[in-house]
């Protein structure tokens, strides 16, 4: 990771630590907007989070996809609900067809964007100002639309069912779903990493039979296996983002989804019954794991895509 990108990561991590405590995350996810507008403003003003993938001539930071991935990975660690994923994808879609008019307001965070892959489950669909539909062949802007929030298992990710009204065809879809898969994989890796950290910390504090449960060899082995799984998945995701393609996107999503699901499942087992209580954060990571795995195609679908490359 470059020095500039590491500085970006540290800046986001500091903001998250200060403004996105578990209590703040819960308050944000239960709010009318589904995110904390003050934190969103700080991310846009101090980090330029919504401007990272936009060229400087259009009011952006002139960064790369990997920069946005770094921010999403840090936000994923604390399950911070923000409009960043959808807004970034909308910006990439608009840039791919040369439609630059909305970019300045998106970069400032004044407007929220999102992308429709499945109209029944649109990220931040009920709060978006700019909505782009991608069907694998064509990008279409939904100039008017009706959105209905959907009840979700993962309350940290706002989803809505959206029906289009007036639409405008923008141009060819150059693989926006693959870009979305890469960014979501980065977010998943962040969540997996933090969930594992929380589990290790708990195993050191929880005493049973007169000693911390983390000192028992069976649990040591399980957590060591999880560490390898997360580290391996992170390497795959980072390499995939550096060399994006349809194949690398499927790889990233498969490994990230499997890693997060494995970590959260073991976290529930190691924590015991407390993990599934509303007051404990592990249940939020468990729900994020299974909710995210179903968006943009579940792991088995990614595996089928990879198999098609071989057979």
UniProtKB/Swiss-Prot annotation:
One of its GO terms (biological process) is cholesterol catabolic process. It catalyses: 3-[(3aS,4S,5R,7aS)-5-hydroxy-7a-methyl-1-oxo-octahydro-1H-inden-4-yl]propanoyl-CoA + A = (2E)-3-[(3aS,4S,5R,7aS)-5-hydroxy-7a-methyl-1-oxo-octahydro-1H-inden-4-yl]prop-2-enoyl-CoA + AH2. Binds 2 FAD per heterotetramer. Pathway: Steroid metabolism; cholesterol degradation. Disruption phenotype: Deletion mutant grows normally on glycerol but shows impaired growth on cholesterol. It accumulates 5OH-HIP in the culture supernatant. FAD binds at residues 206, 273. Its cofactor is FAD. The keyword Oxidoreductase applies. Pfam families: Acyl-CoA_dh_1, Acyl-CoA_dh_N. It comes from the Bacteria. Its EC number is 1.3.99.-. One of its GO terms (molecular function) is acyl-CoA dehydrogenase activity. Keywords: Cholesterol metabolism, FAD, Flavoprotein, Lipid metabolism, Oxidoreductase, Steroid metabolism, Sterol metabolism. InterPro entries: AcylCo_DH-like_C, AcylCo_DH/oxidase_C, AcylCoA_DH/ox_N, AcylCoA_DH/ox_N_sf, AcylCoA_DH/oxidase_NM_dom_sf. Heterotetramer composed of 2 IpdE1 subunits and 2 IpdE2 subunits. Involved in cholesterol degradation. Catalyzes the dehydrogenation of 5OH-HIP-CoA to 5OH-HIPE-CoA. PANTHER family: ACYL-COA DEHYDROGENASE, ACYL-COA DEHYDROGENASE FADE28. Belongs to the acyl-CoA dehydrogenase family. This is Acyl-CoA dehydrogenase IpdE2. It comes from Mycolicibacterium smegmatis (strain ATCC 700084 / mc(2)155) (Mycobacterium smegmatis). The lineage of its organism: Bacteria, Bacillati, Actinomycetota, Actinomycetes, Mycobacteriales. The gene is ipdE2.
